[in-house]
Amino acid sequence: MTTLNVARVYLRVSSEDQDLQRQEAIIGNARESGYYVAAVYREKASGARSDRPELLRMIEDLQPGEVVIAEKIDRISRLPLVEAEKLVDAIRAKGARLAVPGIVDLSQLTEASRGVAKVVLQGVQDMLLRVALQIARDDFEDRRERQRQGIDLAKGAGRYAGRKPDTKMHERVIALKSGGCSIAETARLAGVSVSQVKRVWAQNQTKDKV
């Protein structure tokens, strides 16, 4: 009897002006590898946030035996290690596993092993994952520090004008919320976090009162 390998694909970029197109090839690659792609979750939000609507929806949708596929581990998380491990635990708690390039998957060997060998293989798998998650976080911190240094230099030279607001995202959030969508539904449809919806909506309400 043939076993159906089911995958859920998670695609993420950090901001609204970035394009997910480059990651779309993952879907075709997964199918060519023999996976049935149950759903694709596309998100434009920082990997350093844990309240990403599409990520949370994917975890909610996961079924036992399914596989989460992403381009790299930093697409799943750039969170601090403790929070990142909680995120991975939430995926594993649904009976699913990660399939991400750069991380050796020992799950099948672990399942087939017994006793000490099983414990050792599981320990190695967890260690490799922790290292990858920490590298993803370190890269995020390094980028943020370089950005801060660049801003400081630009301010010193009188060239820094501040970050421009994402007007398209703001307009989409306001339109959805004004149309009667809840905060959570607006976040999901707009592909942003709940906190972003609250902030944009609060700014809009304040502006209307002025």
Swiss-Prot record:
Indicate the segments forming the Resolvase/invertase-type recombinase catalytic domain, all copies.
Answer: 6-150
Q: Which residues form the active site?
A: S14 (o-(5'-phospho-dna)-serine intermediate)
Alphabetical list of SUPFAM superfamilies matching this protein: Resolvase-like (SSF53041)
Example GO molecular function = DNA binding
BP GO terms, sorted: DNA integration
What InterPro entries is this protein classified in? Answer: Recombinase_CS, Resolv_N, Resolvase-like_N_sf, Resolvase_HTH_dom, SSR_resolvase
A Pfam short name: Resolvase
Keyword Transport assigned to the entry: answer is no
Q: Any idea which residues the entry calls the DNA-binding region?
A: 191-210
Q: Keywords assigned by UniProt?
A: DNA integration, DNA recombination, DNA-binding, Plasmid
What family is this?
Answer: Belongs to the site-specific recombinase resolvase family.
**Role played:** Site-specific recombination protein.
- Name the chain's protein: Resolvase
Its organism's taxonomic lineage begins at: Bacteria, Pseudomonadati, Pseudomonadota, Gammaproteobacteria, Pseudomonadales
